């Protein structure tokens, strides 16, 4: 079963790639006092972030302004189908939500993205997302017939995001938000999603080198999706092997129980499926659809760690658990200070 149900969930799986970075660091440990005192005396030479000089004067060690990350992200997520409308060969679509029953729908993804970012302010980071990947979607149909399929797809993703970061004593906070689109050829238009995450953590600095540090955190992740997906797919893409083991009498009995408008569309599709199973070419037969869906659980917990080797290189990892979503992220970030101020 290719397209109609499976492709609708591809976009959900690349939308969770978020950006996160600590904007500022400070420590009361007397071991680091000479280092932070030197920051207070330094004339911050770079254009960005804005207010960077003031941050140094207050003793905050801020990241270099410009960065680029390579990110690997994998996720498993459950999807709930709320309603479905179907048409055939351009006919008016009819609501079959009360007559088709889906079982569990589970999507697994592997995504690879590049994320350029800029600290505009010591506490404000903006970034872009561009990448792609693959996903495996498991869809099961319970009624009118039992049917399961596993499909694999490729998709491209792009988006924009913003992170607010700060600290309260030894505890740092980061609030990340992004709006992401996933483009799959089989879907009429890119699928948007809004992602938000809040992290609370602590940074442990190297005893001898303040620019080295280990950060750990916990938090919560939230995702909101565009509910409706609309498109049109060839019947042979949706049911490439339909007819092998399927009983058309059962489908006829089911369609006989439908209201007239729904029965007309269902019989048209069943007729085409039966012709296809008998070897008749049905390449021009298309199914139009309008699907409403949602993530089964919009919230899940996240736990992560970050090791800063120096001011240039940062390695970050994060694990998402609980809810009906699990995820793992690995992020390597490289940073440069950027342009100096004109004297």
Give, region by region, the residue ranges found by the protein language model.
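Residues on the lipid-exposed face of transmembrane beta-strands in outer-membrane beta-barrel proteins
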Residues: 59, 70, 109, 114-122, ...
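Residues that define the transmembrane beta-barrel architecture of outer-membrane proteins
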Residues: 64, 108-112, 152-158, 188-196, ...
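Transmembrane beta-strands of outer-membrane beta-barrel proteins
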Residues: 66-71, 126-128, 171-175, 196, ...
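Outer-membrane beta-barrel translocator domains and adjoining extracellular loop/strand segments
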Residues: 80-87, 137-145, 180, 184-191, ...
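Short loop/turn motifs that connect adjacent beta-strands in outer-membrane beta-barrel proteins
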Residues: 23-25, 55-66, 118-123, 167-173, ...
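Outer-membrane beta-barrel transmembrane domain signature
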Residues: 180-310
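Short glycine/proline- and aromatic-enriched beta-strand/turn motifs that initiate or cap beta-hairpins
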Residues: 22-108
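Transmembrane beta-strands of outer-membrane beta-barrel pores
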Residues: 72-78, 130-136, 166-170, 177-185, ...
């Amino acid at each position: 079963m290719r397209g109609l149900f499976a492709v609708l969930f591809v976009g959900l799986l690349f939308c969770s790639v978020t950006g996160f970075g600590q904007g500022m660091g400070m420590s009361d440990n007397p071991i680091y006092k000479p280092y932070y005192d030197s920051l207070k005396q330094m004339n911050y030479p770079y254009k960005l972030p804005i207010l960077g000089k003031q941050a140094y004067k207050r003793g905050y060690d801020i990241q270099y302004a410009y960065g680029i990350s390579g990110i690997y992200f994998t996720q498993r997520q459950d999807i709930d189908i709320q309603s479905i409308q179907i048409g055939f060969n351009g006919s008016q679509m009819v609501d079959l939500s009360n007559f088709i029953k889906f079982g569990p729908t589970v999507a697994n993804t592997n995504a690879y993205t590049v994320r350029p970012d800029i600290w505009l302010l010591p506490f404000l980071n903006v970034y872009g997302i561009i990448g792609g990947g693959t996903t495996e979607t498991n869809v099961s149909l319970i009624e009118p017939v039992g049917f399961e399929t596993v499909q694999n797809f490729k998709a491209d993703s792009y988006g924009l995001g913003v992170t607010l970061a700060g600290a309260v004593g030894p505890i740092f906070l980061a609030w990340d938000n992004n709006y992401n689109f996933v483009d799959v050829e089989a879907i009429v238009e890119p699928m948007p999603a809004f992602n938000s995450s809040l992290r609370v953590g602590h940074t442990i600095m190297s005893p001898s080198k303040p620019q080295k540090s280990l950060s750990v955190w916990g938090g919560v992740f939230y995702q909101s999706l565009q509910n409706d997906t609309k498109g049109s797919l060839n019947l042979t893409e949706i049911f490439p092997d339909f007819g092998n083991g399927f009983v058309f009498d059962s489908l006829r009995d089911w369609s006989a129980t439908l209201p007239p408008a729904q029965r007309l569309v269902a019989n048209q599709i069943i007729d085409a499926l039966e012709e296809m199973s008998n070897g008749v070419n049905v390449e021009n037969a298309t199914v139009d659809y309008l699907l409403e869906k949602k993530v089964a659980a919009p919230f899940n917990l996240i736990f992560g760690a970050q090791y800063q080797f120096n001011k240039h290189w940062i390695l970050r990892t994060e694990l998402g658990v609980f809810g009906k979503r699990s995820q793992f992220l690995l992020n390597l970030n490289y940073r440069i200070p950027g342009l100096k101020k004109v004297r």
